[in-house]
């Protein structure tokens, strides 16, 4: 890989896209693995290998500017193998130069069914087609339609569809950290970060869950996604102006504030 030229996007590879559709494929394996940088990965448990460094959702070395810079610096420095101590210094240098927080945009709706999901999906596809790494995000979704990720976590079906539009080959629970599944009689099962967390009434959800685990999960997911993607396309829920839950609404403006997102309001002209 060091001796060859920049590979570009190798669509003929049977594993493409391993990260996002327009990824730079020069480095099939990251020369910095395991970097153990919390901005780019996390420790995970492997059934076969025990504790490993998991960077499934790290796109850093597959960005064209990063791959080009690292390729040139590896050649110039004479680094030829993974054990070279100069790799650690090159990693720090590269991260300082290129790592940046992803830009967030929030799609809000004047009402439910205004078209937020369709607009968010379209923006994901447009940004992906332009060569950016992009991910969808919806902090809180109420739906009985869900999908299971490759790691066994449950997320809403629409976020899974948006991930496909964004070119994300392996979506994680981070794109939908809170999934509410209505059970009737005012109760919902809450799936937190892909795992069932209990049944809540509407009152208990907003008074007990949202201020603690709900807000914490929202911030963890936003930090995770913004550290790994160029763009985070966020989708709100219902209307951002429901005054009865405004102070405890983590699906709309509070999520937008946490991500410092620009907001687009979708309005159904029939209303």
Which residues fall in each region the model found?
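Flexible phosphate-sensing "switch/lid" loops adjacent to ATP/NTP-binding sites
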Residues: 93-271
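Cysteine-centered metal-binding/redox modules
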Residues: 1-97
């Amino acid at each position: 890989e060091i001796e060859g030229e920049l590979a570009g996007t190798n669509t003929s590879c049977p594993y493409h896209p391993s990260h996002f559709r327009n990824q730079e494929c020069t480095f099939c394996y990251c020369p910095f693995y395991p970097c153990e940088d919390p901005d780019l990965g996390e420790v995970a448990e492997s059934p076969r290998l025990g504790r490993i460094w998991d960077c499934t959702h790290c796109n850093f070395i597959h960005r064209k500017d990063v791959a080009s810079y690292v390729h040139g610096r590896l050649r110039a420095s004479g680094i030829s193998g993974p054990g070279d101590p100069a790799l650690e210094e090159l990693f720090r240098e590269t991260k300082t130069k290129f790592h940046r927080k992803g830009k967030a945009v929030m799609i809000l709706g004047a009402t439910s069914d205004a078209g937020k999901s369709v607009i968010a999906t379209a923006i994901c596809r447009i940004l992906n087609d332009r060569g950016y790494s992009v991910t969808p995000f919806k902090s809180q979704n109420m739906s009985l339609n869900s999908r299971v990720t490759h790691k066994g976590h449950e997320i809403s079906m629409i976020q899974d569809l948006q991930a496909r539009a964004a070119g994300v080959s392996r979506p994680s629970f981070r794109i939908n950290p809170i999934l509410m599944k209505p059970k009737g009689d005012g109760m919902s099962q809450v799936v937190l970060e892909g795992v069932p967390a209990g049944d809540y009434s509407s009152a208990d959800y907003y008074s007990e869950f949202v201020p603690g685990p709900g807000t914490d999960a929202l911030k963890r997911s936003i930090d995770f996604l913004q550290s790994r993607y160029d763009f985070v396309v966020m989708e709100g829920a219902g209307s951002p102006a429901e005054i009865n839950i405004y102070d405890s609404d983590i699906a709309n403006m509070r999520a937008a504030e946490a991500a410092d997102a620009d907001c687009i309001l979708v309005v159904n002209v029939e209303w």
